[in-house]
Amino acid sequence: MRGRPRPHAATRIVDRLKLHRRRLRLDGREYTIVGLRPGMDARFSTNHFHGTWHVLSDWRGARLLGRLLWGLAYQRIPGTLVLIDRMFLDPNPFDGEPADPIVLVPVRITALTAQAGRALRRRLPLEETADGTVRWHTPGLDAAVAAWRAKSDRSARPCLWSSAPSGTAGARAGRVGGLMTIAGDPDALREAAVSVHTLGDHAHEGMDYTAIDWPNGEVQVFRDYRQRVSAARVARQEVLAGLTAVPHPDDLRPLIWHRSTEVRRRQRVAPGPHS
């Protein structure tokens, strides 16, 4: 009988993280799909707003995503992809719309076609037994993060809030076959990894972000990401319950944004169980 992973063992985001490995044939090609194991306490979402694809999470998710990107730069098996499957996805924290699965692509060894992306999406969530586990090696990431922090000019960081965000020039973000993708060669993946891993270091009002292939992509994190997701779920339910007909998404979203703000306000002032 296959045992469940121990929570403390499955959720530590460190070098040599244990991940699942599956071999799939998609669009006539062999792929090695590396994914998170059940028990990993990390949550993500995606959305597309103002022409930009966003990966959304919290501080913890940024650390994990950074480690996944860094380790991917060292993979050598053609057809390797990293998948963040549906069980780790939330509705987005703004209007509660469903998230796309997230795939990380090392472009020097893997080509993800739209047909392969659609074939993979149709098979999600991947519930069949994994072919095995891998230890995700991230050599040099901690040193690279420490070096970035040592030379980071904190006084210059606030300029991000009045101009286009800085980020990584080499990695590319987009949507392929219904999957949100971040793709790049090894140098681009490592650069993106450090930029993502350090999100939260210079947060402004509980939020931080970094561009990936600006203006096409961005990773954005919130300190209260999970509370925002919860509020967006409630807001979407409340707004839809009060409508006789569902409006166009462009008209519906502002209603949910406004209601979500109200829900978060209610949650903050709600009395505790012993009040």
Protein language model annotation of sequence segments:
Residues 2-275:
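Positively charged, low-complexity terminal tracts
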